A protein has these predicted regions:
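Feature captures the catalytic ectodomains and active-site-proximal regions of enzymes
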Residues: 1-386
Length: 386
């Protein structure tokens, strides 16, 4: 293959994994929840074979499937963006990244206060939209930073743009990133700027400061082989800027799709790795199945035109990184789910590979298809689909 587009529909899981009970996610199924919405319309992907995936018995089967299909089970101990993307890129994480259900300890907060010169508000798990509603006015009065976390391995800093300009907030995040290492090496430090008057609203100028992957990823291998590795959306931040030759941020799914389409019209040799974040950020965590379904339709409607631009030696792999069931009311966090692997292209054989153990099979497959040497626990399915 000359070009592979790897598109992550962030949080679009396809049903609980066998160990879902250990994560508090029994019964979760993101795609099924969206399929029950009156806004759901994925006619193109259904015609390619979406309903033929293992466990997706609530969607019609394709008359003549066009895609190579697999349901992938996570091997890593986690259900967050970082762990999921790392595994897609070839790394299995035996231990989950640290989480803070009781807030961050003083040995983290003390140096953070000293180095930023600002106090800290909240310091506990919180919804991102609720935390600015509940602490925003106190933040405006005091200038103290709103620090909070979630069920994921994250240290989030919210600040009003009139009090803390974005670049200063990013500097505070860099300070936190240096403090949060070793036993407190959280997956991501996230800048969460907000604006307006109470109840306030978050801006799209969020920025993630990720911990570096602990081993080489397939991204590193692609760059080492002298090929292109293009990151679209938050891929740059998830991998801490490592293993890429070019990157572009996006303001949301619509922008991400437009930028991905533009890369389809450009010459390159290697991988274009795309994250579409709105599914997770705007609809999954906010438990909005209709919004999620509309976003899935937007992607589905975009896909045929994109496929028409692919050449003989091109392929697209559509997948996810975890679940975030928009109807799951026991919590508002990610859900431990299988993910889809849907491969399309002129050379792709329509074959169903069933259920496979490991998101890392994608990394092994990408490496083989691009003829890039890379060692991963994953098993390539390249020879089965082309």
């Amino acid at each position: 293959m000359k070009r592979i587009f790897l598109i992550v529909l962030d949080s679009c899981g396809i049903g609980e994994e066998p160990d879902a009970a250990e994560f508090g996610d029994v019964g979760s199924n993101t795609l099924r929840a969206c399929a029950a919405s009156p806004e759901f319309d994925m006619r193109n992907l259904i015609s390619y074979g979406l309903g033929d995936l293992d466990g997706v018995d609530y969607l019609p089967k394709a008359a003549q499937p066009k895609a190579a299909l697999a349901r992938l089970q996570e091997r890593s101990r986690g259900k967050d963006t970082t762990i999921g993307h790392w595994e897609i890129a070839g790394i299995v994480s035996e231990r989950p990244l640290p989480t803070y259900p009781n807030g961050f300890p003083e040995d983290v907060l003390r140096p953070f206060r000293e180095q930023t010169g600002r106090g800290v508000l909240c310091n506990k798990p919180y919804s991102g939209t609720e935390v600015i509603k509940d602490y925003g006015e106190e933040h405006l009065k005091t200038g103290d930073l709103i620090v909070y976390t979630s069920a994921d391995s994250v240290f989030q800093i919210a600040a009003h743009e009139s009090i803390v300009p974005d670049e200063q907030l990013y500097d505070y995040c860099r300070i936190a990133r240096k403090i949060l290492n070793g036993e407190h090496g959280v997956g991501r430090v996230i800048a969460r700027p907000f604006e307006g008057e109470w109840p306030f609203h978050r801006t799209p100028r969020r920025h993630d400061f990720s911990i570096e992957p602990p081993q080489q990823t397939v991204l590193d291998a692609i760059v080492a082989a002298g090929k292109d590795m293009i990151a679209v959306g938050k891929i740059h931040d998830i991998f801490a800027g490592r293993g890429m030759t070019e990157f572009v941020y996006t303001t949301g799914n619509t922008d991400g799709l437009a930028k991905t389409m533009a890369y389809a019209d450009k010459e390159f040799t290697g991988l274009c790795f795309v994250n579409l974040v709105d599914f997770d950020m705007l609809y999954g965590h906010r438990r909005d199945p209709d919004g999620y379904a509309r976003a899935l339709h937007e992607f589905d409607a975009w896909l045929p035109d994109f496929l028409a631009r692919l050449g003989e030696d091109d392929m697209v792999i559509i997948t996810a990184d975890h679940g975030c069931d928009p109807t799951y009311l026991k919590h508002t966090d990610h859900t431990r789910e299988y993910i889809p692997m849907i491969a399309l292209g002129k050379q792709v054989r329509p074959v169903n590979l069933g259920t496979r153990p490991g998101f890392c099979d994608i990394a092994a497959t990408v490496a083989e298809l691009l003829d890039v040497p890379y060692e991963t626990p994953g098993r390539s399915f390249a020879h089965e689909i082309v």
